[in-house]
């Protein structure tokens, strides 16, 4: 089972444009996050999923420098962007992370993935985000590629398509 962390990133944030590449202690915030994700033992590959807007060319350049896979797709249909990123990177299990959380804990990532792999609950989704059980910024969502493909095929909600996982929780 290929476990791929898909990091959702874009430069056109409405509240703080460019925040994912803003420097924190002389390093881009996304660089700090990638370092922490790389410490997670359960993650086999990391891919940054960004938009096909030209403003996100900076993220593609950053991914190249960081030696991280990149997928570019629709700005608004983030669900489809995740699906294509998973397909192109051979993901069986997807760990969804957002690029504006540089303090993500690798042990929490490993814990969520290990629960998912146990399948003792018969679930295709494991999360500490719904209901929130950890502080904001430590959110980890883990789901099967099959669940992602079903959500992408079945939902027509623009909200679901923009926010990736709401379909899972209904």
Model-derived features with residue positions:
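N-terminal glycine-rich phosphate-binding loop and ensuing alpha1 helix
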Residues: 2-50
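Acidic helix N-cap motif at the loop->helix transition within catalytic regions
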Residues: 55-64
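Glycine-rich, basic loop-to-helix element that forms the pyrophosphate-binding segment
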Residues: 59, 77-85
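Conserved donor nucleotide-binding strand/loop of the catalytic core
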Residues: 64-76, 87
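Acidic metal-phosphate-binding loop of nucleotide-sugar-dependent transferases
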Residues: 76, 101-103
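Conserved donor-nucleotide/metal-binding helix-loop-beta segment in metal-dependent transferases, i.e.
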Residues: 84, 89, 105-133
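Short aromatic/hydrophobic "clamp" motif used to bind/position activated sugar donors
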Residues: 94-95
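Active-site oxyanion/phosphate-handling segment shared across diverse enzymes
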Residues: 143-170
């Amino acid at each position: 089972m290929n476990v791929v962390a898909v990091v959702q990133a874009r430069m056109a944030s409405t509240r703080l444009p460019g925040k994912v590449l803003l420097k924190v202690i002389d390093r881009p915030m996304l660089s700090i996050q990638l370092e922490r994700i790389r410490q997670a033992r359960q993650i086999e590959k990391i891919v940054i999923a960004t938009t096909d807007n030209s403003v996100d060319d900076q993220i593609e350049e950053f991914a190249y420098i960081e030696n991280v896979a990149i997928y570019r797709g629709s700005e608004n249909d983030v669900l489809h962007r995740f699906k294509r990123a998973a397909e192109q990177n051979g993901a069986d299990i997807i760990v969804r992370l957002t690029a504006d959380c540089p303090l993500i804990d690798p042990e929490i990532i490993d814990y969520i993935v290990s629960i998912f792999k146990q399948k003792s609950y018969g679930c295709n989704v494991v999360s500490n985000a719904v209901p929130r059980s950890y502080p904001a910024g430590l959110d980890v969502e883990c789901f099967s590629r099959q669940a992602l493909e079903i959500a992408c095929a079945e939902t027509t909600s623009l909200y679901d398509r923009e926010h990736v996982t709401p379909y899972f929780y209904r």
